[in-house]
Amino acid sequence: MAINLFTSESVSEGHPDKIADQISDAVLDEILKQDPKARVACETYVKTGMALVGGEITTSAWVDIENLTRQVICDIGYTHSDMGFDAHSCAVLNAIGKQSPDINQGVDRADPLEQGAGDQGIMFGYATNETEVLMPAPITYAHRLMEQQAKVRKSGKLDWLRPDAKSQLTFAYENNKIVGIDAVVLSTQHAEHVSQKDLVEGVMEEIIKPVLPSEWLSQNTKYFINPTGRFVIGGPMGDCGLTGRKIIVDTYGGAARHGGGAFSGKDPSKVDRSAAYAARYVAKNIVAAGLADRCEIQLSYAIGVADPTSIMVETFGTGKVSNETLVKLIYQNFDLRPYGLIKMLDLIRPIYRETAAYGHFGREHFPWEQTDKAEALRAGAGL
């Protein structure tokens, strides 16, 4: 059989786009703590010496945007001008307005169950049984490399590590089964003084080896560690960052389709976020139930309308029952109206800042990762 290669990438919490995502979701969380009915669409832009927080927010809550922004940047690790960005001295600009009343009248209803979608759009969810968390392996392990980079950096074990980093993994598949890792790319921002030799050795021993399963590595695996040879200038000094610019990193690493809507900074009335979480929940439960090895769900909505305008299921030839049967089971077991899925997944909680780095999916403590519907789906399918 032919070997197929598939690649996914991740970025660290110190990547400029991820700084922006985390600030936007920190604002959302602080508002939801005070006002569960808030409408939030918060966008952030970061560049050398500044963070601009804007968007449309309608709420009774009061949030100290400046202090919160500085705290997030500080928690990530940008605390000194040597890194090109300093939480204590950067300018924080606030350009927040209110949500349009035209949108409000389409979303808000006297009966919460009839709450309309906050916008039209398409959302995808995906699951595969190739990892224990029912996620594609390339994105799962790319995230784990970035989590390990942050852990080692914050522990002080490699004191020359800096917050900005990227990983990329190429997996080899035969017959849709993993046969190994073909290539590992890891670039990390670092202090000026460290040698390339020490950096390569430190990254290999402290970040790569503890994360990647040895059975997938071989003498043919290629390693590219800081392949340019220098990565001192990073973070917002190296590139400006924007909320919502890492939507493939946030989801399935390119292994599934994407509807185009970003997540961070949006309250759960925005189906871009909440319905994408629900679609993951549905797909994961179908795979957990053994009804398919791989499953992709598409949902679509019209602004101001509660019921989804469509539900599509694709199992890539791995389904144990027909796609038509799966669609019926979805309608029977999941309430995919905006208010229904918010209740189903208990989404009006301050849980979003944590989602804004290292992926929204495949992390078992989030409610959309539960497999509590698997048994009912199996029974409904007659298996």
UniProtKB/Swiss-Prot annotation:
Q: Which one of the record's GO molecular function terms can you name?
A: methionine adenosyltransferase activity
One GO process term, biological-process aspect: one-carbon metabolic process
Q: Quote the cellular component terms of the Gene Ontology held in the record.
A: cytoplasm
Where, in this chain's numbering, is K(+) bound?
E43
Reactions this protein catalyses: L-methionine + ATP + H2O = S-adenosyl-L-methionine + phosphate + diphosphate
> In the Enzyme Commission scheme, what number(s) does this protein have?
2.5.1.6
Chain residues that bind L-methionine: E56, Q99, D239, K270
Coiled-coil annotated residue ranges, if any: none
Explain how, and how many, cofactor molecules are bound: Binds 2 divalent ions per subunit. Binds 1 potassium ion per subunit.
Co-factor requirement: Mg(2+); K(+)
Residues that hold Mg(2+) according to the record: D17
Can you tell me which residues bind ATP? H15, D164, A165, K166, R230, F231, D239, R245, K246, A262, K266
Tell me which Gene3D superfamilies the record gives: 3.30.300.10
Q: Where is this region: Flexible loop?
A: 99-109
- Matches recorded under InterPro entries: ADOMET_SYNTHASE_CS, S-AdoMet_synt_C, S-AdoMet_synt_central, S-AdoMet_synt_N, S-AdoMet_synthetase, S-AdoMet_synthetase_sfam
Which HAMAP family does its entry note?
Answer: S_AdoMet_synth1 (MF_00086)
PANTHER family under this entry?
A: S-ADENOSYLMETHIONINE SYNTHETASE
**What this chain does, per the record?**
Catalyzes the formation of S-adenosylmethionine (AdoMet) from methionine and ATP. The overall synthetic reaction is composed of two sequential steps, AdoMet formation and the subsequent tripolyphosphate hydrolysis which occurs prior to release of AdoMet from the enzyme.
Quaternary context: Homotetramer; dimer of dimers.
Protein name in the entry: S-adenosylmethionine synthase
Write down the species.
Actinobacillus pleuropneumoniae serotype 3 (strain JL03)
Supply the gene name: metK
